[in-house]
Structure formats: C-alpha cells, structure tokens
Amino acid sequence: MSVLNNSEVKLFLLIGIPGLEHAHIWFSIPICLMYLLAIMGNCTILFIIKTEPSLHEPMYYFLAMLAVSDMGLSLSSLPTMLRVFLFNAMGISPNACFAQEFFIHGFTVMESSVLLIMSLDRFLAIHNPLRYSSILTSNRVAKMGLILAIRSILLVIPFPFTLRRLKYCQKNLLSHSYCLHQDTMKLACSDNKTNVIYGFFIALCTMLDLALIVLSYVLILKTILSIASLAERLKALNTCVSHICAVLTFYVPIITLAAMHHFAKHKSPLVVILIADMFLLVPPLMNPIVYCVKTRQIWEKILGKLLNVCGR
C-alpha cells in the first residue's frame, strides 16, 4: 500500500541549484553560516528581551514574536536544505513534505501577521503617544500574540489534508530545496482546483496584511508631517526604520517570485531558486541585525551583557 491513496509516487525529489550540483558542498558553507547567524541572532534578541525588565514593553514583545517566527522559518527549512546541499540527499517522503509545508507556510503567515501588528504599534506610538501604554497593555499584547498564532495555524492547517487527497502518478521533481504548497500541488495528476483556490486565498490574506501595513504607514506619514519640529519629525520617522526594513526583506522576495511566476515568460530557474532561498534565509538573518543596530536600547543591553561576561 502506498503512502498516498492510489498513488504511485512514494518519494518527492528536492532540487538544489541546477547545473551546479558538483558545487553544492561549497554552497552549503554560506547557507550553514547564515542559518547559524540567524538562529544565534534571534536567540540573542529573545534572551535580552526576557532578561531585561526595561525591555518589557509592547514594542519589544512584538519584536520577540518576530524573532520566534524568524526562528520558525529557519528551522522549518533547515533540515532539507542541509540534506540537499551537504549530502546531495534529494528524496523526501510525501508526508514529511506536507509537514514541512505546514510549518513553512504557518510561520510565513505568522511573520506577516507580526509585521502587521508591529505597524499598528508604530502608528499608536506616533499618533497617540500619551495613550500608547494604556492601549497596548501587556495583557492585550499577549492576546494579540495568541490570536495571530491561532490565525496562522487555522489558515494553513488545511494544506496537508488537501494535498494528501491528491494522486501523484509520475511527476515527483519539486522546484526548491524545501517543500511549498504551490510547488507540490502541481505534481498531482488529479484535480487540484481546491488547492489552487485555497492557495490563492492564503496569498490574498498575506497581501491584505501588506495593504494594511501600507495604510498604517500612510497614516503615520500624515501624523509625522503634522509635527512642527523637523528634529521631532526625523526622530519619529527613525523609530520606524527597523520595521520598514523588516517589511521590505520579507515581502520583496515574495512579490518578486509571484511576479516572475505570473509574468516572466522565459524566467531563469536559477534566479527563481535563489530568490526563493533568499525568502527563507534573509529575513531571519537580517531582522536581528537591523534591530540591534537601529534600536539603541537593545544593542546597549547586549553590549552590557558582553562586558559583564568578559569582566568575570
């Protein structure tokens, strides 16, 4: 009896970088380094926020949520990417593939949700600073975190089940070194219309998050322009720089990939694979760096911890 009902395919094949399979071991070095830095950076953010009472504020709680989603993205894709690039082990069972998709898409939706509530945080801090603390209480922040986690799970939990009901006859070659819903459903030899529609719905949810983020920044910009002092304008705008960088590093690869899939007639498979890998590697790596550099309270606390360790 096969892994999937009436299916012939027992194994999906992942792909590294086409034509450069002989150099996979060399590509694995920067990939491993990026994963290591991403995990260390996000763990550092979480540790500093947890251990420093002065950082127990809404802005930093949301940053901790972003670090959790970044670590989730990294750890979800890490096993298969390392297997492909380190050991040229391309095979993955359908059930393992579906499980990986659940976590990758789940943490993607979670990151999108976190970026949205972080934009709300910036809007409240700039537009209504006097009521900021009374509106975003610790209890409300915890409830928001719980809601976005539940939202992420509920949105992606149908993915594994809708994929399991499909039949996979002959095609088994995936397009990346990890599993994605839109990639796997194309291998099916049965009707995948439900998967196409639901995948489009999830994409719309993510784009709705982006639209609301853009709207929040329109309102933020309107508020900033109403401030009389130029120095105060720049100070208010500077508090948004880290979040804007996080939004760009997360959404630009997604939008670029979607545009290439829909509009580029002669797209290069190599370019598509590199951009897809950037989507999972760059945000978890860059977010801790950007927030540590741009947020004085964080790098001061990190520096203080390092000096305490060195002084012992």
UniProtKB/Swiss-Prot annotation:
Q: GO cellular-component terms in the record?
A: plasma membrane
Keywords annotated in UniProt = Cell membrane, Disulfide bond, G-protein coupled receptor, Glycoprotein, Membrane, Olfaction, Receptor, Sensory transduction, Transducer, Transmembrane, Transmembrane helix
Cytoplasmic topological intervals: 47-54, 121-139, 217-236, 294-312
Q: Name one GO molecular function term.
A: G protein-coupled receptor activity
Q: Which residues are glycosylated?
A: N5, N192
| Cysteines paired by S-S bonds | C97-C189
The annotated topology with respect to the bilayer is:
Multi-pass membrane protein
Q: Keyword Transmembrane, does the record have it? A: yes
Q: Which compartment or compartments is the protein found in?
A: Cell membrane
Regions of this protein lying in the Extracellular compartment: 1-25, 76-99, 161-196, 258-272
What biological function has been recorded for the protein in this entry?
Odorant receptor.
Family, per the entry? Belongs to the G-protein coupled receptor 1 family.
Q: What is this protein called?
A: Olfactory receptor 51A7
